Amino acid sequence: MSKKDKKEEIKEEVEATEPTTEESVEEVAEETSENKELQEALERAEDFENKYLRAHAEMQNIQRRANEERQSLQRYRSQDLAKAILPSLDNLERALAVEGLTDDVKKGLEMVQESLIQALKEEGVEEVELENFDPNLHMAVQTLDADDDHPADSIAQVLQKGYQLHERLLRPAMVVVYN
């Protein structure tokens, strides 16, 4: 091989490697552009997935709260009616306490009273317990001095019965308390 041929061969090799370098630079630039687009697409997909999961959790919470509210409404549906009936029940008790009623009238009033009490019990309305004074269930309208026979915070007299619907207080019992 002559020097001329060798120079041409080297020149051809250099020319052959130059386009490869340019092509590889273009390929690398293309790959980084594709990688960048892919990364952005993955970030958007992750963002959408997070938004979907949050929306799904929010819908479940809304459904749970709606169910709880519906159950509460069903459980306490008779609250207003019970509050309206309680004064009538008090009046029946006062009427039964009146002296001079005939036995027939007294028996009729007792039957009406019992039927009202039974209807209220079926709806979950019960009298407030009267063992010891509880400020959550009783309203102290008067106090008396405590002694050996009557310890502090015991109930001396009930002026008006209290009622509760399940665990919700409808009306506190008005009581006289030893203090």
From Swiss-Prot:
It comes from Streptococcus mutans serotype c (strain ATCC 700610 / UA159). Residues 1-40 are annotated as: Disordered. It comes from the Bacteria. Homodimer. Keywords: Chaperone, Cytoplasm, Stress response. PANTHER family: GRPE PROTEIN, GRPE PROTEIN HOMOLOG, MITOCHONDRIAL. InterPro entries: GrpE, GrpE_coiled_coil, GrpE_head. Participates actively in the response to hyperosmotic and heat shock by preventing the aggregation of stress-denatured proteins, in association with DnaK and GrpE. It is the nucleotide exchange factor for DnaK and may function as a thermosensor. Unfolded proteins bind initially to DnaJ; upon interaction with the DnaJ-bound protein, DnaK hydrolyzes its bound ATP, resulting in the formation of a stable complex. GrpE releases ADP from DnaK; ATP binding to DnaK triggers the release of the substrate protein, thus completing the reaction cycle. It holds the Pfam family GrpE. Residues 1-14 have a biased composition (Basic and acidic residues). Its main location: cytoplasm. GO terms for cellular component: cytoplasm. Residues 15-32 have a biased composition (Acidic residues). The keyword Chaperone applies. It is found in: Cytoplasm. The gene is grpE. PROSITE patterns: GRPE. This is Protein GrpE. The keyword Cytoplasm applies. One of its GO terms (molecular function) is unfolded protein binding. GO terms for biological process: protein folding. Belongs to the GrpE family.
